[in-house]
Amino acid sequence: MDQAKLARMQASVRIDKSATNPINRGKGTPRRKVKKVHKSSGADDKKLQTTLKKMNVQPIQAIEEVNMFKEDGNVIHFAAPKVHASVPSNTFALYGNGEEKELTELVPGILNQLGPDSLASLRKLAESYQNMQKSQAGAEGKKDEDEDDIPDLVEGENFESNVE
């Protein structure tokens, strides 16, 4: 048997008869680690499917992408999702991998999909983005002005004599 494997097995055993390790000595059988079995998400999907069947959802075909706009300006983008809907219960279910993207990444492709309220929110977002850019540029400008008053340190020169 491999010596390293034997040493690992001895270290994992609770009963140790050596006098050098009095902490682990004791009677009884060693405790064994319980292997935890994690539930797979497949069980959750099955429960969800049965609940949706009770609501009598119907699949909607030919949906290429779904975009969900968040308040912070980001978009949750689903490419080729599976969509099920139940109009009487006003319920829609989306299946697929959603990616969180910035609105600027999707702008050219989604302009024709936006409604009037989304266009208004897009304008507000563009204005806030421009204001943020201006404020950052203004902060950098103030930073540069403050740095003009501070002379650069050059090796061999003494600026304290100029102050006096």
From Swiss-Prot:
GO cellular component terms listed in the entry, alphabetical order: nascent polypeptide-associated complex; nucleus
Compartments in which it is found: Cytoplasm; Nucleus
Disulfide bonds: none
Keywords: Cytoplasm, Nucleus, Protein transport, Repressor, Transcription, Transcription regulation, Transport
Positions of region (Disordered): 1-45, 130-164
Gene3D superfamilies xrefs: Nascent polypeptide-associated complex domain
Annotated Acidic residues bias: 145-164
Metal-binding among keywords: no
Description of how the protein assembles with itself and partners: Part of the nascent polypeptide-associated complex (NAC), consisting of egd2 and egd1. NAC associates with ribosomes via egd1.
Protein name: Nascent polypeptide-associated complex subunit beta
Native species: Aspergillus clavatus (strain ATCC 1007 / CBS 513.65 / DSM 816 / NCTC 3887 / NRRL 1 / QM 1276 / 107)
Gene: egd1
